[in-house]
Amino acid sequence: MKKRLLPIFFLILLTFGLALPVSAAENSIDDDAQLLTPDQINQLKQEIQPLEEKTKASAFIVTTNNNTYGDEQEYADHYLLNKVGKDQNAILFLIDMDLRKVYISTSGNMIDYMTDARIDDTLDKVMDGMSQGNYFAAAQTFVQETQAFVDKGVPGGHYRVDSETGKITRYKVITPLEMVIAFAAEIG
């Protein structure tokens, strides 16, 4: 009797588990500074969803006009830590109207996709919208640039430095030449 009930239990659990909606993108926009319209927020949530699905990471767009930390990096890092926890996959784009700065914070696998150079490139492109006061365009650019870098993959020669311990972790990416050599060695 128990052997027949166990598969039924798992079938019911699986059925209801798959029926629950994914709401990761639902909490992705925190517009405390009220820079975006409700329609713009909904559109950004839709644009964020494919990025979150591909990277298995949370993506956040946060606006504030009351930075209690006095530093955009500290504000963004604490926000991310409170939302997802330490070393979980996430990226955050902060528009800080209090300090008049923008910042991108990464955690988990997003550190590998969004290197410092890629973040700088993204922030340069975001500044076009920011300088015109078009915060929606700036947020869209952030999502589009992040998605483009994710599509390119983790760059070769990438490494991480743990800010607490100073430990360096290098990541090896197999080049096309190495793939050909490995394939030739396998068939030869």
Ranges and model annotations:
Residues 20, 26, 183-185:
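Intrinsic disorder/low-complexity segments
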